[in-house]
From Swiss-Prot:
InterPro entries for the chain: Ser/Thr_deHydtase_PyrdxlP-BS (IPR000634), Thr_synth_N (IPR029144), Thr_synth_N_sf (IPR037158), Thr_synthase-like (IPR004450), Threonine_Synthase (IPR051166), TrpB-like_PALP (IPR001926), TrpB-like_PALP_sf (IPR036052)
Binding site for pyridoxal 5'-phosphate: G277, N278, F279, D281, T449
Residue positions, PTM N6-(pyridoxal phosphate)lysine: K124
Name listed for the protein in its UniProt record: Threonine synthase
Pathway: Amino-acid biosynthesis; L-threonine biosynthesis; L-threonine from L-aspartate: step 5/5
Lineage summary: Eukaryota, Fungi, Dikarya, Ascomycota, Saccharomycotina
Transmembrane regions listed in the UniProt entry: none
Miscellaneous notes: Present with 26000 molecules/cell in log phase SD medium.
Family recorded in the similarity comment: Belongs to the threonine synthase family.
Organism: Saccharomyces cerevisiae (strain ATCC 204508 / S288c)
């Protein structure tokens, strides 16, 4: 019998109904438009954390965490261990997410957590390698005893502002009974990101280049999930950051890096700084903190698309008129899709007296208001509640570029360390927070979300003044150099229209030989 942290409910539901882990993963988005969450966050005591978990490998730690959220009846121990082992065998680092400590000589408490050692050189591989294997595991089990004509197939539809698309494609390419459609805004992702997605030859993969913004693409995906007829006909699944399995998989590196930065001792204080757009990455840190990991604070680092920074300062969640194109395009969003999950827990604690159903009703009302008016205002208690766990910093394009330059010049471990622009947003915010912090013993872990090679223009613009710098020699891995020579496979969608996208998906599904 699953416990309360192994069943899931919608953030917008005022019904007591819960579903299984498998249903939450395959379905992705709730039919009422809400996101799936465990109503109870499991607790881990300090003795277990520092006597046991601190000594575990990344893979064993992932198993210990995931076991708390996945019932044994759904995935037995041996199967879960195998899924985890296969998911992280594709990484270039034995540690999976290594921590580069004391990067600059002058700040011994600034550490960079490298999350880009997976197949697509982005943090999203940590989750999407696991999600791809999960989808295949559930489908194979479902289809094992079904005749050929009745086997279940999943159509994964996702939107990307850059890295999610390639990570999803690499996680799902060649998987049996899964077809993948990734939408991205034409001309708004880096050339390498586009090449990574469009050069995958597997028949079950198709990229759709949409005239418009990332938010247009995300709105289309949400509309497809809300279309019951299309959804039912094609069994649509989600791998965007709304999929609960992605949040779950990302929790591991908060625990793992915390133990590295503190040598497994509970006496040191740690703050995490996370470049944030859709809020999925930092939300995993929130779950780690609520489970018992003694994180002092989670700092949201935003670029000029600063809905999260504005919310924490005012309590007003307001969609801007347009997206600002920045040097950190994966964070160029108007609406932060995972923020709804945090709002549910805050609403339950501060407005609903611990009532799950009431919390769902409150969140649903907020998001209906957002849909109608483009904004909603929350009670002061919600801002105060959020501020207990979160702080935020907004970083400009100029500061992003300056930080890439500064770290290249000042880094000693290793020398000439190169940041991608998203990581630079985080490091700039980190340095600001360190300067403001009276307690100089606090360790700061700044999350590095992508390899600098994926953002050549931003990196080159920042570093072109250094005579000894060469993008080809210092930054670009051999594997990524080859991409430009490969044949591209993509379909253009002339305007951001859900019907055009649905038609394109159906045309391609008819051609695919799954």
């Amino acid at each position: 019998m699953p416990n309360a942290s192994q069943v899931y409910r919608s953030t917008r539901s005022s019904s007591p109904k819960t579903i299984s882990f498998e249903e939450a993963i395959i379905q992705g988005l709730a039919t009422d438009g809400g996101l799936f969450i465990p109503p109870t966050i499991p607790q881990v005591d300090q003795a277990t954390l520092f006597n046991d978990w601190s000594k575990l490998s990344f893979q064993d730690l992932a198993f210990a965490i995931m076991r708390l959220y996945i019932a044994q009846e759904e995935i037995p121990d041996a199967d879960l261990k195998d899924l985890i082992k296969r998911s992280y065998s594709t990484f270039r680092s034995d540690e999976v997410t290594p921590l580069v400590q004391n990067v600059t000589g002058d700040k011994e408490n600034l550490h960079i957590l490298e999350l880009f050692h997976g197949p697509t050189y982005a943090f999203k591989d940590v989750a999407l390698q696991f999600v791809g294997n999960l989808f295949e595991y559930f489908l194979q089990r479902t289809n094992a005893n079904l005749p050929e004509g009745e086997k279940k197939q999943i159509t994964v539809v996702g939107a990307t502002s850059g890295d999610t698309g390639s990570a999803a494609i690499y996680g799902l390419r060649g998987k049996k009974d899964v077809s993948v459609f990734i939408l991205y805004p034409t001309g708004r992702i880096s050339p390498i990101q586009e090449e990574q997605m469009t050069t995958v030859p597997d028949e079950n993969v198709q990229t759709l280049s949409v005239t418009g913004t990332f938010d247009n693409c995300q709105d289309i995906v949400k509309a497809i999930f809300g279309d019951k007829e299309f959804n039912s006909k094609h069994n649509v699944g989600a791998v965007n950051s709304i999929n609960w399995a992605r949040i779950l998989a990302q929790m591991t590196y908060y625990f793992y890096s915390f133990f590295q930065a503190t040598n497994g001792k509970d006496s040191k204080k740690v703050k995490f700084v996370v470049p944030s757009g859709n809020f999925g990455d930092i939300l995993a840190g929130y779950f780690a903190k609520k489970m018992g990991l003694p994180i002092e604070k989670l700092a949201i680092a935003t670029n000029e698309n600063d809905i999260l920074d504005r919310f924490l300062k005012s309590g007003l969640y307001e969609r801007s008129d347009k997206v600002a194109a920045t040097l950190s395009p994966a964070m160029d969003i108007l609406i932060s899709s995972n923020f709804e999950r945090l709002l549910w827990y805050l609403a339950r604690e501060y407005l609903a007296n611990g009532d799950d159903l009431k919390a769902g009703e409150i969140v649903n009302n907020w998001f209906q208001e957002l849909k109608t008016n483009g904004k909603f205002q929350v009670d002061k208690s919600i801002i105060e509640g959020a501020s207990k766990d979160f702080t935020s910093e907004r970083v400009s394009n100029e500061e992003t570029s300056e930080t890439i330059k500064k770290i290249y010049e000042s880094s000693v471990n290793p020398k000439h360390y190169i940041l991608d622009p998203h990581t630079a947003v985080g490091v700039c915010a980190t340095e600001r927070l360190i300067a403001k912090d009276n307690d100089k013993s606090i360790q700061y872990i700044s999350l590095s979300t992508a390899h600098p090679a994926k953002f050549a223009d931003a990196v080159n613009n920042a570093l072109s003044g250094f005579s000894n710098y060469s993008f080809e020699k210092d930054v670009l891995p051999e594997e990524l150099k080859k991409l430009s020579t490969l044949k591209k496979k993509l379909k253009f969608i002339e305007r951001a229209d859900v019907e055009l996208v649905k038609n394109a998906i159906e045309e391609e599904l008819a051609k695919m030989k799954l």
